Design a protein with these regions (language model features):
Chain A
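A structural signal for short loop-to-beta-strand junctions that line the ligand-binding cleft
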Residues: 88-89, 96-97, 126-161, 191, ...
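Conserved N-terminal structural module of periplasmic/extracytoplasmic solute-binding proteins
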Residues: 2-108, 123-125, 250, 299, ...
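Short amphipathic alpha-helical coupling segments at ligand-binding clamshell hinges
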Residues: 59, 230-237, 319-331, 421
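Extracytoplasmic/periplasmic solute-binding protein
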Residues: 142-148, 153, 177-224, 230, ...
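Hinge/lid segment of periplasmic solute-binding proteins
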Residues: 103-153, 205-207, 291-293, 377-379, ...
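Conserved C-terminal helix/tail region of periplasmic/extracytoplasmic solute-binding proteins
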Residues: 163, 381-444
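C-terminal lobe and pocket-closing loops
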Residues: 274-286, 299-403, 440-444
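Glycine-centered hinge/linker elements that transmit conformational signals in sensory
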Residues: 221-250, 295
Length: 444, 317
């Protein structure tokens, strides 16, 4: 009678939600102190900081030694439910002042009113970071955090197999399609790319690169545009990959996903800095056969890449936002901190979001992975400098992404086209925003 | 284990009428309430309060202002969430998918369980004990572990079964279209056969042996005894296991969620109602809508279980 066991499984989720409830009952003191801070706080303060990046705790100790006025209490919040715990803590009034979060979640938390507006106290740090990174912490033009790391997009490919199939590293996305077809003429089974059925991030990257703007803040409303010429150009590449069966569909959650590349059935991928440290363990058979190249572009004269950002968000109820921002800026931009964090020994996997990354690039490259034929450091530095700064996360990005995930699977199975998906997502997004009381119009 | 192998009393016919309870005095009633207090408190704390909380959540919606970043308001919107759920095509599609899949899978699972129980009923006692224990093993393995085990067997990138098939010169796939349901159904059936068989087997043991002797004297063969005497006398337990399994299927969550790791394009985030609710609450962050969906699912499950019980009971009697 398997319903008992199904229940046992479901109880995992139930336990998670119950813990939310319990947490919600736990605290409750002054959660309404979220006034917009403009002045510097005085005196000695202690603030809590959540992160789950290796090597960060050691850095907070360094900071604490040098800054007796602002003491950081580090909490390792590692776990699958970190964001849920954080949400519960904010609602209970027991949230930390500062927490690690990715750019998408920062926008999501901000939209749910769980962050503190630090536009005024954080402005002085803006110049340290790339424009795209600052965008990531300033959804809708309001700053809610400090950038921590970036992961600009570039390409890794199996140089040995490219040579075998007589193709070269693609400069444009059209080149990639052509190379994929050419390789398949030599070997029917080989795929040039991978698109996971659960993960529309390929489309996000392509759209970001093509200059599309899914969300654009204009005065008091959002212009939602999933069907602009740029967005459709990006969608068309995905469509061609699907139609011509040029991409494998290994799920990134599949334990065997890396075999796809290690055994050479898929021969290229777009990748980023955060993946570099895990190559050595995951590609035992193809070690030394890899080479890095720029991500394929839409316009080689005007190269543009995409990037996810790691950020440090200042949460609602934080009493010392100026100190939190000061510490965050030190952690993510000072030479002292970055030199340690970008050292592979720290295991942080961090790639900075600062304007000049050149001092930190060399150390993060796993040299035994690549054949030494291309300048890996240059590829990474260039990718970081080309991140398009037009991209914005809208206030319902998470809900939109979830909706897109559902349709993305259908696109991969050729049940609907990318264009149909984009058209329906555009309508869905506008309706959902209006439903939440936010003004939005469809773009084109 | 020993408690499981012992034949359990199963209500196949309505038992003799219980003597009407003595009229208890006020003091007695009071004492009775005291005895149930621990249960009542637990029931209140773990069922009534959370359900009440979910209900109050479901009557609200989160609204933003301006560009949507910044403070939000939770406003009372009455039954608007419920109206949305009732008109939510994806939610009802997941319900229909789960029901259709469940009705086929449960029939197969109970059919096999019944067959095995009947076979066991016919063999020697020592063999019975061995087979019962062996068939119960899948049930003893935690569902997450067994799902992961099947996940590795089904994995498009690492499955040894796919390797074998390729060496044999054929290409098979475990997901996509009907295959998705066959793969998932196989997993759930594998997990569920043992336990259901134990229950059916136990109620078979409780049947009076004299019936079989009488039938044999009348010249009935074993299969005839099984079909005409054993099966009609254990319909009670078949209905019960059927109903429990049906409720279990409507709450299907962990197995497809884990399987989604290797077949995301075939098992979508709204594959089952529970997965859809989980996605709304913890991925999208819309607790209010998820609460409304949960309550609708609970009510729909309750109605279905009631109808199922009524219909099957009427047919049997």
């Amino acid at each position: 009678m398997s319903q008992f066991r199904t229940r046992a499984l479901a109880s995992v989720a139930a336990a998670a939600s119950l813990s939310l409830l319990l947490a919600a009952c736990g605290g409750g003191e002054d959660s309404d102190s979220a006034a917009k801070p403009t002045e510097a706080t005085k005196g000695k303060v202690t603030l809590e900081f959540w992160s789950w990046t290796d090597g960060i705790e050691a850095q907070t100790k360094v900071w604490n030694k040098e800054h007796p006025e602002t003491q950081i209490k580090f909490v390792n919040a590692a776990g699958d439910t970190a964001y849920q715990k954080l949400r519960a803590a904010v609602n209970a009034g027991t949230a930390p002042c500062l927490s690690k979060m990715d750019g998408m979640n920062l926008a999501n938390f901000a939209a749910d009113g769980l962050l503190t507006d630090i536009t005024d106290v954080a402005g002085q740090y803006k110049g340290k970071y790339t424009a795209a990174a600052w965008n990531a912490v300033s959804p809708g033009g309001t700053t809610f955090g400090i950038p921590m790391g970036s992961s600009p997009l570039f390409t890794a490919y199996r140089a040995d197999l490219f040579e075998k199939y007589g193709i070269e590293a693609p400069k444009t996305w059209d080149d990639l399609i052509a190379a994929g077809k050419k390789a398949q003429k030599k070997n029917k089974k080989v795929k040039i790319f991978n698109m996971a059925g659960e993960d529309p991030s390929t489309l996000v990257d392509l759209s970001w690169e093509s200059g599309a703007q899914w969300y654009k803040a204009e005065d008091d409303h959002w212009v939602v545009d999933f069907t602009s010429p740029e967005a459709l150009k990006a969608g068309d590449i995905v469509q061609q990959l699907v139609d011509n069966d040029l991409a494998s569909n290994a799920s990134y959650a599949d334990p065997g996903v890396f075999k796809t590349w290690d055994l050479g059935t898929t021969i290229a991928m777009t990748t980023s800095t955060w993946q570099l440290p895990i190559y050595n363990t995951n590609f035992p058979k193809s070690k030394g056969k890899w080479q890095l190249a720029d991500s394929p572009m839409f316009d080689t004269a005007k190269p543009q890449t995409s990037s996810n950002f790691d950020t440090l968000g200042v949460l609602k109820g934080c009493k010392y936002p100026d100190r939190a921002a000061e510490f965050a800026a030190w952690l993510s931009s000072s030479k002292e901190s970055l030199t340690t964090l970008t050292d592979p020994a720290s295991k942080s996997g961090l790639f900075p979001a600062v304007t000049d990354v050149s001092p930190y690039v060399d150390k993060i490259i796993p040299t035994e992975m690549f054949n030494g034929e291309s300048d890996s450091a240059k590829v990474i530095t260039d990718a970081a400098s080309w991140v398009g700064d037009q991209w914005q996360y809208g206030p319902n990005y998470a809900a939109m992404y979830s909706e897109m995930q559902k349709q993305w699977g259908k696109v991969m199975k050729k049940e609907i086209t990318v264009k149909e998906m984009l058209t329906s997502i555009e309508k869905w997004t506008v309706d959902d925003l209006n439903d939440k009381g936010i003004k939005a119009v469809a773009g084109s | 284990m020993s408690t499981l192998t012992r034949p359990a009393k199963v209500a196949t016919d309505s038992p003799a009428r219980r003597p009407s309870p003595r009229r208890a005095g006020r003091r007695g009633a009071y004492k009775g309430v005291l005895f149930t207090l621990p249960f009542l408190l637990g029931f209140l704390a773990t069922y009534v309060v959370p359900i009440g909380y979910a209900f109050s959540q479901s009557l609200h919606e989160k609204k933003s202002t301006g560009l949507g970043f910044g403070p939000t308001r939770i406003v009372y919107t009455g039954f608007s969430n419920f109206a949305s759920v009732l008109g939510d095509g994806a939610f009802w599609a997941s319900m229909g998918r789960t029901l259709l899949f469940g009705s086929v899978q449960i029939t197969v699972m109970l059919g096999i369980a019944l067959l095995l129980a009947l076979l066991l009923d016919g063999v020697a006692a020592r063999a019975v004990r061995f087979f019962r224990a062996a068939l119960l093993i899948p049930y003893v393995i935690p569902a997450v572990v067994s799902t992961l085990m099947w996940l590795f067997l089904y994995s498009p990138t690492g499955s040894p079964l796919l390797d074998l098939a390729e060496r044999a010169g054929t290409e098979i796939t475990f997901f996509g279209g009907l295959n998705t349901y066959l793969s998932l159904g196989n997993l759930l059936t594998w997990q569920g056969i043992g336990f259901n068989m134990i229950l059916i087997s136990a109620s078979l043991q409780a049947l009076p042996r004299e019936l079989y002797e009488a039938a044999r004297l009348d010249g009935a063969r074993e299969w005839r005894i099984a079909w005409s005497i054993k099966v009609p006398n254990i319909t009670g337990i078949l209905v019960l296991t059927g109903m429990f399994s049906l409720i279990g299927r409507l709450q299907l969550f962990g197995e497809p969620l884990i399987m989604r790791q290797i077949a995301p394009e075939s098992i979508n985030t709204d594959f089952t109602p529970m997965m859809e609710i989980y996605d709304k609450a913890f991925k999208v962050g819309d607790y209010q809508y998820a609460a409304a969906e949960s309550l609708v699912l609970a009510v729909a499950t309750g109605i279905l279980a009631f109808v199922f019980y009524r219909v099957t009971n009427r047919k049997m009697s």
